[in-house]
Amino acid sequence: MQQEIRNSNTPNTGSGNPVSNLSSALRQVHLGNSNTTTDQSNISIDYTSRAPQQQPLDELSRGAAGGPAAGGGPEGSNMVGASSAAQVTAFGGPSVVDSSRITKFFQNQPMEGYTLFSHRSAPNGFKVAIVLSEMGLNYNTIFLDFNLGEHRAPEFVAINPNARVPALIDHSLDNLSLWESGAIILHLANKYYRETGTPLLWSDNLAEQAQINSWLFFQTSGHAPMIGQALHFRYFHSQKVPSAVERYTDEVRRVYGVVEMALAERREALIMDLDSENAAAYSAGTTPLTQSRFFDYPVWLVGDHITIADLSFVPWNNVVDRIGINIKVEFPEVYKWTKHMMRRPAVIKALRGE
């Protein structure tokens, strides 16, 4: 695991004004005026078949994405191969369910560790896998076959009444079942902290815990669904609706503007803290922050180390180029942040489906 660099909170100047030219410039970013409250996404696609044509996030994915693992599709969606679309109903999958593989698993469950139910094209499933991998936990992944209707197997619906992925079984807690990616990774973070006393991907500070929760809810309710809707209307909706494509793509940009601002302020605080001999020049704007040797150091949304708040964005950042957003050009802080996370061995392992 790469060494974490200390990062202080955004400095308080007493006047509420930004302390350098970086945050001043970023405050000009158009954050939009959307008042959307949509929290559902529907994508009908298996990106596995599209993987050879995709080059998501250029060098960010080299050696890390491992092919189809980084594909796109949210909770609340059943993704099926485009070639088999005619064989399924609108949202429910095939009319006949083959649940034999799922039934066999539930007849002989493990006694320990975790079982993750996911899909090869489900970013939210890989979100959970990343956290499990980062924590070094023992887990096995069952990638459901939606073409067989495995997500509708009675045994699976019993642990996830929403019949979507991801779902997780915690075998150490009498086969406790959890669903919804945000709830799952919060459980993992809290359990790890309680059992070990180490706030891995978490915090022992109550205020920071609240901030982590805020970003996590922002990602699950705003970031992921907007990308999901943009993908749906761009590629798979039965009719071309340019206004819908534009509306959801603009909303994704607005969301990234929020993240970009937060990361930029974190970077500014880090540079002012670690590069104190040049702080006056940075504050005056006579020396750009880009000249600091700390300009490419990792910064995180909350506190001085990576948390579940940061990692929850990774799989979705890896597919956003498919809606025409180049984060390297449009959101450079988001790009650097994603790059640091995509290079982590545990993230690489999880995205490869290992």
Curated annotation (Swiss-Prot):
BP-aspect Gene Ontology terms: negative regulation of transcription by transcription factor localization; nitrate assimilation; protein urmylation; regulation of nitrogen utilization
TM stretches of this protein: none
InterPro entries: Glutathione-S-Trfase_C-like (IPR010987), Glutathione-S-Trfase_C_sf (IPR036282), Glutathione_S-Trfase (IPR040079), Glutathione_S-Trfase_N (IPR004045), GST_C (IPR004046), Thioredoxin-like_sf (IPR036249), Ure2 (IPR017298)
Domain GST C-terminal: 205-354
Region Disordered, residue ranges: 1-80
CDD domains the UniProt entry points to: GST_C_Ure2p, GST_N_Ure2p_like
Highest taxon listed in the record's lineage: Eukaryota
GO molecular function: glutathione peroxidase activity; glutathione transferase activity; phosphoprotein binding; transcription corepressor activity
Compositional bias segments (type: Polar residues): 1-56
Keywords: Nitrate assimilation
Comp. bias regions, Gly residues: 64-75
Gene3D superfamilies: 1.20.1050.10, Glutaredoxin
CC terms in the record's Gene Ontology section: cytoplasm
Residue intervals of the GST N-terminal domain: 112-196
Assembly and oligomerization: Homodimer.
Family: Belongs to the GST superfamily.
Cited function: Plays an important role in the cellular response to the nitrogen source. URE2 gene plays a major part in the repression of GLN1 and GDH2 genes by glutamine, and is required for the inactivation of glutamine synthetase. URE2 gene product may catalytically inactivate GLN3 in response to an increase in the intracellular concentration of glutamine.
Official protein name in the record: Protein URE2
